[in-house]
Amino acid sequence: LLISSKGFQSYLEKEHRVHSDRIVYMPQYAEDLFTQKLETVEHQDVNLVFAGNVGIAQNVDTILMAADALKEERRIKWHIVGDGVDLERCKEMAKTKGLNCIIFHGRKPLEEMPYYYAMADAMLLTLMDDPDISRTLPGKVQTYMAAGKPILCAANGEVQDVIHEANCGYAVNAGDWQGLAKYVKRFLEQRNSVPFGEN
């Protein structure tokens, strides 16, 4: 059995009594265009980019709440690049909170995505608090890492493990917008001295 996340191994062994000899870990790969050196995009602000599906499982509320907590930090721009069933609600939430620092770009073709990665000072990753989701490793993790970008994350389980092992960013528990805001501030203070993203 091929698994894309190590979190599935213990689940298969315990719940389905699959012997470890039958399980092979094969993580998802990043598209080649993200493994090449990204062109530099000159910018004055600090750009934090979330890329991908904007669904219930992605818990983008965590980003919006962190942005709300840090809205006095006017140099931070929070970019949401993607589409999904929760996008319109997130837009409405941002509007209600007066979060002009959040920019919704909508869905973009794959060939345009390197631009958004190049403009990013760090990438954002959030997931909801769910035991099944905590066993997964979203493909965007490999893509973020392949692009050499630091990851600021609020998710449980496998994602946290990978970020800590690779030393490629900061991770807090799913839904912890206060913790995410704290680490965004720390990233701002240390981004020129801590070599995150060199993975």
Label each PLM-derived region with a short phrase.
Residues 45, 77-82, 88-114:
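Nucleotide-activated donor-binding/catalytic signature segment of Leloir-type glycosyltransferases, i.e.
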Residues 125-134:
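Short Ser/Thr-rich beta->loop micro-motif in glycosyltransferases that lines
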Residues 7, 26-29:
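Carbohydrate-associated surface elements
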